[in-house]
Amino acid sequence: MQGKRCRSGAAQEALLILAMETNEPTPTTEAAESDATVAARRKPRKLVVALTALAILLCVLAAAFFAYASDSYHDLDAHHRNLVSTETLPVQQGDNYLAFGDPNAAVGLVFYPGAKVEYSAYAPLMRDLAERGYLAVVVQMPFNFAFFDINAADRVRADFPDVGAWWVGGHSLGGSMAAQYAVDHAGDGTLDGLVLLGSYSASDLSSTNLGAISLYGSNDQVLNRAKLEDNADLLPKGAETVEIEGGNHAGFGAYGPQSGDGEASITPAEQQSQTADAIDRYIRARYAEPSLAAAA
C-alpha cells in the first residue's frame, strides 16, 4: 500500500515537472486561468449594466424635469396687446428679450422672470416702468428658469450701449439670480443697483455700493418670509424694503393665480403701478445724491 502511495506521489511529481518543462498548464493552473477569464468577462458586463442603469435614471430625471417645467404660468394677454409698439412707447423684440421704452434712456433695468413664468407676462410692469422714463427689458429664460442663464443681462446691455446706467432685477427665483449677477458685477463699475420683487438675495451684497430695493405683497404666501428677514443684512447699506398692502406673489405679473399664493385684495394692475412708482422714487432718490448724479 505504501508503495502504491509512493508511486502515486512520484507520478504526480513527474506530471508537474513535465508540465513545467513543456509549458502545459496543470489542472490547478487551468482552473485559475478559467476563473480569471470569467472574471474578466464579467467586468464589461457589470459596466454595461451600470451605464444602462445610469442612462435610464437620467432619462427618468429629464422626463420629470420637462414635465415639471412644461407646467408653466402663461401670459394672460393672448392677443399681445401689451406688446404693441407706439411712437411714445416703443417695444423692441430681441432674440431672447422684450425691451420697452427709450433705447437711449438714462437708466435701464434688465428683469429676470420668476420660475416657470412666461416672460411676456411681465409686459404690463415693464410698460409701467417705461412710461416713467426707463428702458425696461424682460428676458426670456431657458425652460423659464433664470438659473439657466444668470448672465443674460450681459447681452441685453450690449444691445443698448447708449443707456446711461444699468440696474438688474427680477421676480421670485429671477430676483435671486439677478442678485447673483449683481454680486458678480458689483466691482466692475457697470451696474448701479438691484430690484427684488417677491424675492430675496442669497448672495452677499452688503459691502457693495449698489442701490437695492425689495418689494413684496402683504398677502404673498409663496415668498419665504423667514428667508426674506434673515437675508436682509445681505443687501447693500441703504437698501429699502417696501410692503405692498393687499398685493400677493403673482400680482407682479399677468399670469393668473399661482399655486400656494395668498389672495390679493388689489388688482394686478394696481400692484404693478405701485411697484413701478416705488422703484421710480427709489432710483430717482439714488441719483439725486451728488456721488451718483453723474451716473444717470
Give names to the regions the model predicted.
Residues G189-S199:
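A conserved short beta-strand
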Residues N231-A296:
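C-terminal catalytic-base region of ester-bond hydrolases, centering on the histidine
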Residues S214-Y216:
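Short beta-strand/loop motif that positions the catalytic acidic residue
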Residues M126-A146:
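Conserved alpha/beta-hydrolase
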Residues L125, L223-D233:
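Short alpha-helix in the alpha/beta-hydrolase fold that links the catalytic acid
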Residues V49-F66:
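Hydrophobic membrane-insertion alpha-helices, especially the h-region
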Residues G170-A178:
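Gly/Ala-rich beta-loop-alpha elbow adjacent to hydrolase catalytic centers
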Residues A106-G114:
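Short beta-strand element of the alpha/beta-hydrolase
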